[in-house]
Amino acid sequence: MIITVGGLPGTGTTTTSKLLSEKYGLNHVCAGFIFRDMAKEMNMTLQEFSSYAETNTEVDNEIDRRQVEAAQSGDLILEGRLAGWILKRSDIKPDLSIWLKADPMVRCIRISERENENVDLALEKMISREASEKKRYKEIYNIEIDDLSIYDLTIESSKWDAKGVFNIIEKAIDNLKA
């Protein structure tokens, strides 16, 4: 089974992906972790690496390559803002493609708690990062990140806690057509 989980920062994609991975015994591959690892390898902050990635397409190409390679082996949770799009463009059909969304201030508060920084700083970083990513996705892939047409399931994650979001997805998985 291949499941993609996408969403903007602070929507709960990592928490949800980990819960799904544990429940269904699937490998969890996260584009964000790949991106963070690459930033560390180049001794850059996430903001610096995001700016670098805007003009260096090899960053996105490497992330894409690793995602496709993982999906070709099957049986995984593929987490990333473009995970669903990358598989679609590689003619790999996930069993379920999910997009999580949440109110921007809810996301900002979640990020500030996760990163242990004040809300104003988290908001500033979040806005900068999302603008950078949106620009990159449009220029490199001609993808509008706001286009949710490829997703089977879209969940407003600020309405439920992590377990509630997981329960909705679990019901969807349990009711997939064979």
From Swiss-Prot:
Keyword hit for Transferase: yes
Enumerate the subcellular locations listed in this protein's record, separating them with semicolons.
Cytoplasm
Spell out the reaction equation it catalyses. Answer: CMP + ATP = CDP + ADP; dCMP + ATP = dCDP + ADP
> Is Transport set as a keyword in this record?
no
Q: Which EC number applies?
A: 2.7.4.25
- SUPFAM superfamilies in the record: P-loop containing nucleoside triphosphate hydrolases
Residues of the signal peptide: none
Which leading EC class covers this enzyme? transferase
Gene3D superfamilies named in the record: P-loop containing nucleotide triphosphate hydrolases
Q: Return the NCBIfam families for the record.
A: cyt_kin_arch
Q: What is this protein called?
A: Cytidylate kinase
